[in-house]
Amino acid sequence: MTNLNYQQTHFVMSAPDIRHLPSDTGIEVAFAGRSNAGKSSALNTLTNQKSLARTSKTPGRTQLINLFEVADGKRLVDLPGYGYAEVPEEMKRKWQRALGEYLEKRQSLQGLVVLMDIRHPLKDLDQQMIEWAVDSNIAVLVLLTKADKLASGARKAQLNMVREAVLAFNGDVQVETFSSLKKQGVDKLRQKLDTWFSEMQPVEETQDGE
């Protein structure tokens, strides 16, 4: 297993939907979460960069798929935040279509990190993201963010509750606590990413039956 240097991660491009992404080769790991789950902060903590992923005081502002390259052919994908109440319904549907299309069709997608506020985990859209991933045979790491907001006992109780709940998905779903502020859970996140980035990809199909 390769230990990648996530501090070398750099922004590549933004895309409004899957059709505007670069060629479907290499390995991608996607980050998804509700608009206030701390996704941008987690990416910045992972890479030890203060502004790699733009954090916003306005939830729902990140409407694009953002790609970051860790190493040649190895990318992190920041998916649009979902579930923000004040976003118009039409825009919500558009985001959900883009998310579902990416999870179902992107061949280079190796793993999905779903971030949830530890105080409010497993909302409907969180569960839908996990379900989409499991249905597409994609491994999932659930990060219960803002873990520093709870005392140790409450933190463990939430962790155990979510671990029990995700068994119902019958998929490869791991759950860990995470705090960008305290740098808690960063090592486990890096270990999981290293594993996913080290896995062999299936041989690409040739065109025209060649």
Swiss-Prot record:
It comes from Escherichia coli (strain K12). NCBIfam families: GTPase_YsxC. The gene is engB. SUPFAM superfamilies: P-loop containing nucleoside triphosphate hydrolases. Its cofactor is Mg(2+). Mg(2+) binds at residues 40, 62. Residues 25-199 form the EngB-type G domain. One of its GO terms (molecular function) is metal ion binding. GTP binds at residues 33-40, 60-64, 78-81, 145-148, 178-180. One of its GO terms (biological process) is division septum assembly. GO terms for cellular component: cytosol. InterPro entries: G_ENGB_dom, GTP-bd, GTP-bd_ribosome_bio_YsxC, P-loop_NTPase. Necessary for normal cell division and for the maintenance of normal septation. Depletion of this protein leads to a severe reduction in growth rate and to extensive filamentation, with a block beyond the stage of segregation. Essential for bacteria survival. HAMAP family: GTPase_EngB (MF_00321). This is Probable GTP-binding protein EngB. The keyword Repressor does not apply. Signal peptide: none annotated. Pfam families: MMR_HSR1. Keywords: Cell cycle, Cell division, GTP-binding, Magnesium, Metal-binding, Nucleotide-binding, Septation. Belongs to the TRAFAC class TrmE-Era-EngA-EngB-Septin-like GTPase superfamily. EngB GTPase family.
